[in-house]
Each structure stands twice: as C-alpha cells, then as structure tokens.
Curated annotation (Swiss-Prot):
The keyword Lyase does not apply. Belongs to the RRF family. GO terms for biological process: translational termination. It is found in: Cytoplasm. One of its GO terms (molecular function) is ribosomal large subunit binding. It comes from the Bacteria. It comes from Prochlorococcus marinus (strain MIT 9515). The gene is frr. It holds the Pfam family RRF. InterPro entries: Ribosome_recyc_fac, Ribosome_recyc_fac_dom, RRF_sf. Keywords: Cytoplasm, Protein biosynthesis. This is Ribosome-recycling factor. The keyword Transmembrane helix does not apply. HAMAP family: RRF (MF_00040).
Length: 182
C-alpha cells in the first residue's frame, strides 16, 4: 500500500470515530444528536436531517421544522423511540426538544459509550496497519522490495498507526471532558 492510501484510510477511520462521538449527548443542545435517528417516511427509512430543518435555538433547545408537515408525527415518534432520553414537544408546525442536563449516572454511561467508539476506531486503524504490513511482507517474499525496504516501510506504517491512535485518544479525552462538564 502506498503511504497516501494508508494515511487516507486511517484519516477516514478517525473521522468516522469523530462522527460517532458527535452523536453522544453532552448536556448541551446540538443538532448532530439527531444524526443517527431515521424516520419511516413513505415506506423508507429516512434521516431526520433529510426531512426537516434542524436548528439549535439555545444551549438547551433544538428546533425541528419539517419540510412536509405530514411527517411531523413520524419524526416525533422516531425521536421518542430513540435511546437519547429526550422528549419532543410538538406544537403542530415545529418540534422542540428540550435537552435536560445529564445525571451523573448518564454521564458515566456516555463516557463508556465514547470509550467503546474510540476502541472501535483503534481496531479499524490496527486492521489497516495489519493489511499494509501483510502487503509489505508479501512484496518482500515476491522479491519486489528488499528486506530493508520492507522493514523501513513497516516502521513507517507503525508510526502512522501510533499517530492516528493518539489522535483518537486525544479526541476521546476531549469528549469525556465535554460529557463530564456540568
């Protein structure tokens, strides 16, 4: 694998981990909380952000204004059924969500979830490293590159892996601080 391909793949893993982090509640209203919620709309699962305009009104309130009023109840139901622990208020035109402050117990749960997402990201990085190292060893066996080149490349791959794993750990500690901040 080329250096750029490896870095690109690892970057995508870090970005996916960050997207997972963004779906975790922190006690503040954030439109990305609703990213994983899909609504049954004309027989198909559709993300809320495709059906409505989502805005953060203040630090505790999210406003959802559907493009089609007929899907208002479906959006409300999907939010109620989600694992976010928030209750939508429907006024007939707009859904408002008041994001309550997190309890200490809920904060700890979300920290565990963030750790789980971080570990999944690290596993993805290690899989990329394993594939790249296997390719280097295969190229070495086939005589395409020398033993020294193979070792140098493997060391370089390990450096990339360490760099991106530390990036995920940094993002995890930032997210944990954000979650635990009262």
């Amino acid at each position: 694998m080329k250096e750029q391909e490896i870095q690109s793949s690892m970057n995508k893993s870090v970005e996916a981990t960050q997207r997972n982090f963004n779906t975790i509640r922190t006690g503040r209203a954030n439109a990305s909380l609703l990213d994983r919620i899909s609504v049954e709309y004309y027989g198909a699962e559709t993300p809320i952000k495709s059906l409505a305009s989502i805005a953060t009104v203040d630090s505790q309130t999210i406003s959802i204004q559907p493009f089609d009023i007929s899907c208002l109840q479906a959006i409300e139901k999907a939010i109620s059924m989600s694992d976010l622990g928030i209750t939508p208020n429907n006024d007939g035109k707009v859904i408002r969500i008041n994001v309550p402050p997190l309890t200490e117990e809920r904060r700890k749960e979300f920290c565990k979830l963030a750790s789980k997402y971080a570990e999944e990201g690290k596993v993805a990085l290690r899989n990329i490293r394993r594939d790249a190292v296997d390719k280097e060893k295969k190229d070495e066996k086939e005589g395409l590159i020398s033993i020294d080149e193979s070792r140098d490349n493997q060391l370089e791959i390990q450096k990339f892996t360490d760099k991106y794993i530390s990036l995920i750990e940094t993002k995890l500690s930032e997210k944990e601080k954000e979650i635990l901040k009262v």
